[in-house]
Amino acid sequence: MHCIRPIKAGFNATGDIVYSSKKISKELASFAFPCRKCIPCRLNMAREKAIRAYHESQMWDDNIFLTLTYDDEHLKSDRLQWIDFDLFIKRLNEKLNRGLSKENRRPLPYMVTGEYGDKTKRPHWHVLIFNFRPDDAKKHYVTELGEQVYTSEFIRDLWTHGNIEFGSVTLDSASYVARYAAKKLAHGNDQDHDYHPIHNTSKKHAIGKKWIEKYHEQTFSRGYVVLPNGSQGPIPRYYQDWYKKNHPEKWMEYDAKVKLKSKELAEMQSRKDQLDDFANFINYRGGTNYPLSRTQVKLAILKSKFKQLQEKLKL
């Protein structure tokens, strides 16, 4: 999806970059940046984070999708307390790397989202931890989708605030953790709760970096990433920034050829989706055929598209 409120920029007469349309020189090239705040931008960000997390999981033998909850005894606030998770991940790092030299320390990339229950508004954490799986994993239950869920005394002792359970890292679980970007925008204040969700990633180990370092040639020669179901997805912005920084000459070639072709195909698909969404909207209204303004049409299409992507991201 394309940004609906792009930030326009260009050059003034002296060659400086300016963002005011009044100051932009018409004789020089102008361009636009995604706002990163509108619904399409937020959904794109969530999707890109999910793709990067899934790719990160492919680079390690062991990964877990972990849920950390609070019991009544340790629920000291109805707000998320970042220090609780921060101390947990530090204890895990210390436990796994105790006695090891800096060169031999085990990297522990993670992506975490803290949110509130839909009904109880109770705070809890969902974490993707890469390059780790506890040795004492015990089967806990099987979900309706047939996925095995485990528990671990090792992790419980490190968490100290309540119950824990974990499963496998898949594109679905990665999408679940990455959904914060769309959810925060959709509900404003995390549904009816007046507290925002928290999202963070490991600072030392960029999510997806190992994957793009290994597969950048295939990825940028195609101009897209291949998802587990065989479908094609856009190359995440982080991958593009990495490629531009580390392979500037190849980036220029990609930007001039493959990226242009990918953009044209994406725009064609976007127009098709908009027509389909509008047709569905008209059908939903019972075939009523009274005039709609351009704004009403755009909002109708966005709402339909947003609902589809919410379902896809399991919002």
Curated annotation (Swiss-Prot):
Entry's EC annotation: 3.1.21.-, 6.5.1.1
Catalyzed chemical reaction(s): ATP + (deoxyribonucleotide)n-3'-hydroxyl + 5'-phospho-(deoxyribonucleotide)m = (deoxyribonucleotide)n+m + AMP + diphosphate
Segments passing through the bilayer: none
Keyword flag Nuclease: yes
Keywords, in A-Z order: ATP-binding, Coiled coil, Endonuclease, Hydrolase, Ligase, Nuclease, Nucleotide-binding
GO molecular function: ATP binding; DNA ligase (ATP) activity; endonuclease activity
Cystine connections: none
Coiled-coil segments on the chain, per record: 253-315
Record keyword Nucleotide-binding present: yes
Pfam families per the UniProt record, alphabetical: REP_ORF2-G2P
Family: Belongs to the microviridae Rep protein family.
Function in brief: Plays an essential role in viral DNA replication. Binds the origin of replication and cleaves the dsDNA replicative form I (RFI) and becomes covalently bound to it via phosphotyrosine bond, generating the dsDNA replicative form II (RFII). In turn, viral DNA replication initiates at the 3'-OH of the cleavage site. After one round of rolling circle synthesis, protein VP4 is linked to the newly synthesized ssDNA and joins the ends of the displaced strand to generate a circular single-stranded molecule ready to be packed into a virion.
Protein name: Replication-associated protein VP4
Species of the source: Bdellovibrio phage phiMH2K
